[in-house]
Amino acid sequence: MKRTYQPNRRKRAKTHGFRKRMSSVGGRRIIAARRRRGRKRLAV
């Protein structure tokens, strides 16, 4: 059986990347929350 996680850098960035997050209101909220927490990495 094929495993569910098949790493792919491009797919990862396109799905969870910074620009993708900024493209929606919900995503902007996530970035803001991570900024508030002081996360080193905001998105992938």
From Swiss-Prot:
Region called Disordered, residue ranges: 1-24
InterPro entries: Ribosomal_bL34 (IPR000271), Ribosomal_bL34_CS (IPR020939)
Basic residues: bias regions: 1-22
Gene Ontology annotations of biological process type: translation
GO CC terms, sorted: ribonucleoprotein complex; ribosome
Classification via PROSITE patterns: RIBOSOMAL_L34
A GO term for molecular function: structural constituent of ribosome
UniProtKB keywords: Ribonucleoprotein, Ribosomal protein
Gene3D superfamilies: 1.10.287.3980
Family: Belongs to the bacterial ribosomal protein bL34 family.
Protein name per UniProt: Large ribosomal subunit protein bL34
Designated gene of the protein: rpmH
